[in-house]
């Protein structure tokens, strides 16, 4: 029994001696040992001693670089499709109302209807808002007083490639579902319609004319 105990003590002393020797070797080399389960010594080099979490959580290399935004140039007039004998060219569906919500919602309905009927929609846009002042003449005198102000909102749905045989059916559909207070008109697209989309700036035009 005593012999077995002596062997265990010898093995334990050898293990302690080896650990002490390893610790001394790490200290002389300047490395810091890290103890793990079982008493085994591990050595891990730390390249960032002052920043232990340096580089963790980087994600920018996973995101594609954003392209530089292009400057908006002057809008130019596109070539107008005049159509053929069997189908119309570019048509403008004008929807005018005093209620902006009503005009906008019905323009969306017409746009979705064209998509469901496979009618190509070139674009949908809003025209500049127009304001009309209603003046009232006094009973006595010639002075005019402001009675009310009417604001007109207009939306345009531009379509192309509408066949002549289906045009009558399409117009009947949108006219039958026309809400009260909305005025509908359909006409061919012209260059004047394109220019009418933008507000006139006479002061800027005068300055540009002087510079030229």
From Swiss-Prot:
The modification N6-succinyllysine is found at residue 199. Residues 1-28 form a transit peptide. The keyword Zinc does not apply. It comes from the Eukaryota. GO terms for biological process: mitochondrial translation. It is found in: Mitochondrion. Coiled coil: none annotated. Pfam families: Ribosomal_S10. InterPro entries: Ribosomal_mL48 (IPR027487), Ribosomal_uS10_dom (IPR027486), Ribosomal_uS10_dom_sf (IPR036838). The keyword Mitochondrion applies. GO terms for cellular component: mitochondrial inner membrane; mitochondrial large ribosomal subunit; mitochondrial ribosome; mitochondrion. Its main location: mitochondrion. Keywords: Mitochondrion, Ribonucleoprotein, Ribosomal protein, Transit peptide. Component of the mitochondrial large ribosomal subunit (mt-LSU). Mature mammalian 55S mitochondrial ribosomes consist of a small (28S) and a large (39S) subunit. The 28S small subunit contains a 12S ribosomal RNA (12S mt-rRNA) and 30 different proteins. The 39S large subunit contains a 16S rRNA (16S mt-rRNA), a copy of mitochondrial valine transfer RNA (mt-tRNA(Val)), which plays an integral structural role, and 52 different proteins. mL48 is located at the central protuberance. Interacts with OXA1L. Belongs to the mitochondrion-specific ribosomal protein mL48 family. This is Large ribosomal subunit protein mL48. The gene is MRPL48.
């Amino acid at each position: 029994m005593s012999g077995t105990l002596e062997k265990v003590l010898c093995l334990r002393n050898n293990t302690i001696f080896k650990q002490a020797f390893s610790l001394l070797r790490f200290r002389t080399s300047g490395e810091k040992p890290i103890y793990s389960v079982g008493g085994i010594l591990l050595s891990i080099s730390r390249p960032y001693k002052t920043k232990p979490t340096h580089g963790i959580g980087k994600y920018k290399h996973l995101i594609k670089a954003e392209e530089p935004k292009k400057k908006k140039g002057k809008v130019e007039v596109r070539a107008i499709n005049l159509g053929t004998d069997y189908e119309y060219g570019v048509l403008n569906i004008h929807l005018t109302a005093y209620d902006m919500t009503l005009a906008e919602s019905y323009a969306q309905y017409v746009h979705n209807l064209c998509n469901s009927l496979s009618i190509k929609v070139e674009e949908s846009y809003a025209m500049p808002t127009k304001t009309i002042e209603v003046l009232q003449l006094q009973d006595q005198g010639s002075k005019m007083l402001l009675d009310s102000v009417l604001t007109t909102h207009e939306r345009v749905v531009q379509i192309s490639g509408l066949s002549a045989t289906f045009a009558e059916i399409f117009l009947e559909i949108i006219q039958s579902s026309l809400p009260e207070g909305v005025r509908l008109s359909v006409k061919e697209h012209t260059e004047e319609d394109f220019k009418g989309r933008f507000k006139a700036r006479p002061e800027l035009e005068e300055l540009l004319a002087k510079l030229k």
